[in-house]
């Protein structure tokens, strides 16, 4: 009974924080599906990754906030609402409500047939930017979760190696903890410039952080 009461208190505290969160309110005001849009926005504004005319792949895209931000950034200056200059391909294991101009594929990025569908959608075009907000279902066992997270990031790096332009960029979400240093090293082996970033929209209590790799090593 006590445990149940504690759980209710935790849920109530989370709900209070969520409802009063600056980025939640901003997302509602600006029409984003989730506050996560502002994490990518800060990374992009800091590093200047996204421009009209690019080919961009959004991995782990549901519910679609990152794709919404990317779509807005890729619209040409002065364009009518909804106009997109470039190619934006999104993929997630979960369904995602349609976004005008975005090609969405539903499937598990870890499965070969899904990866083949993604490669077909790219159509051998060099990709400018790959962004990944993918995260596995967490078990709560740090060693197990670290392996699952690392696997997804390694797959994203492999995809980037195959499809990015030489000066392209890869953005991935990861977590401080077991395996973090090894993933930073993996990025350093494959990219000329590596920048760890924790956007302001990432909650202070969260171990969530992001790695950005820019410029493929030959």
UniProtKB/Swiss-Prot annotation:
The active site is at 173 (proton acceptor). Its EC number is 2.1.1.166. Pfam families: FtsJ. It catalyses: uridine(2552) in 23S rRNA + S-adenosyl-L-methionine = 2'-O-methyluridine(2552) in 23S rRNA + S-adenosyl-L-homocysteine + H(+). It is found in: Cytoplasm. S-adenosyl-L-methionine binds at residues 64, 66, 92, 108, 133. Its main location: cytoplasm. One of its GO terms (cellular component) is cytoplasm. Keywords: Cytoplasm, Methyltransferase, rRNA processing, S-adenosyl-L-methionine, Transferase. It is an enzyme of class 2 (transferase). InterPro entries: RNA_methyltr_RlmE, RNA_MeTrfase_FtsJ_dom, rRNA-MeTfrase_E, SAM-dependent_MTases_sf. It comes from the Bacteria. GO terms for molecular function: rRNA (uridine-2'-O-)-methyltransferase activity. Belongs to the class I-like SAM-binding methyltransferase superfamily. RNA methyltransferase RlmE family. Specifically methylates the uridine in position 2552 of 23S rRNA at the 2'-O position of the ribose in the fully assembled 50S ribosomal subunit. This is Ribosomal RNA large subunit methyltransferase E. It comes from Paracidovorax citrulli (strain AAC00-1). The lineage of its organism: Bacteria, Pseudomonadati, Pseudomonadota, Betaproteobacteria, Burkholderiales. The gene is rlmE.
């Amino acid at each position: 009974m006590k445990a149940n009461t504690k759980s209710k208190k935790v849920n109530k505290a989370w709900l209070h924080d969520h409802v009063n969160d600056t980025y939640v309110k901003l997302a509602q005001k600006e029409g984003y599906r989730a506050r996560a849009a502002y994490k990518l926005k800060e990374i992009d504004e800091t590093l200047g990754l996204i421009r009209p005319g690019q080919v961009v792949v959004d991995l782990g895209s549901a519910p679609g906030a990152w794709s919404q931000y990317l779509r807005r950034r890729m619209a040409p200056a002065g364009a009518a609402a909804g106009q997109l200059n470039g190619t934006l391909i999104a993929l997630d294991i979960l369904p995602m409500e349609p976004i005008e101009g975005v090609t969405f594929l539903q499937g598990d990025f870890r499965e070969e047939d899904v990866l083949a569908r993604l490669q077909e959608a790219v159509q051998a075009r060099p990709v400018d930017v790959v962004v990944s907000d993918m995260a596995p279902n967490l078990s709560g066992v740090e060693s197990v979760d670290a392996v699952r997270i690392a696997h997804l990031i390694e797959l994203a790096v492999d995809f980037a190696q195959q499809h990015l332009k030489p000066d392209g960029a890869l953005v991935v979400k990861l977590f401080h903890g077991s395996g973090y240093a090894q993933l930073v090293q993996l990025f350093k082996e494959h990219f000329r410039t590596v920048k760890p970033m924790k956007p302001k929209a990432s909650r202070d209590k969260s171990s969530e952080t992001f790695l950005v790799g820019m410029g493929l090593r030959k």
